[in-house]
Amino acid sequence: KTEQELIDSTMVESLTRLFGITAFAVSDPSFISHAQNNASSEGLYNDEHHLLGIRLDTYNETTKQFQAPYYIILKRNDKNDEFFIFKHTIPKYIHLTELESRYLNLDLNKFVSEVYTRLSLVLRKKIMLEKVETSLKGIELIDADLSFSKVTFQLSNGLKLQLLLDFTEVANACVLESANARLSTDKKLLVQSIMKGSYFTLVDKFQSALEVMKPDYSM
């Protein structure tokens, strides 16, 4: 094998050891709709077309099932021998271009693990938000964007609680009043203080916040 082929082989073997991440050969760039049939444990790097496929599987701890897989095809640039993203199914909210620029040709393992981590954190965020809804009475998740970065819960007392979340934390919380339910400024600030921070203890945060979110006026 040439030096480059040995490097490629080592790179692929390293990737396949990462949990939830699989490197595989890509013989057809239109693989995405048939990717499950293209995975192989041998000849993972397609030297002829300079293509490397990466599959990322995230696991839902609540349902005990893997989610629909995500895929990235990397292609090597003949001019500078560097990889670039040729095809992918990664959602926009993962900010793949940012990660590509920062890590791809400096540390491939780091690039892939960062993508996987972000996908896993969004799934974890979804699970925690759903757990709030199923664990606590009188609260319902009524609105959420695809990345669960902005979510709104309806309380049975007429108030709403809107959360802004990043990959690991509740960045902000806002109490939304209605004509029939009001809350003092001091209580709103206290709720905000309770809710901000890591979302890994979101159920506990909500339990504390609900004690505060008893309307000063309701009909």
Regions found by a protein language model. Give the residues of each.
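Internal amphipathic alpha-helices that form coiled-coils
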Residues: 1-4
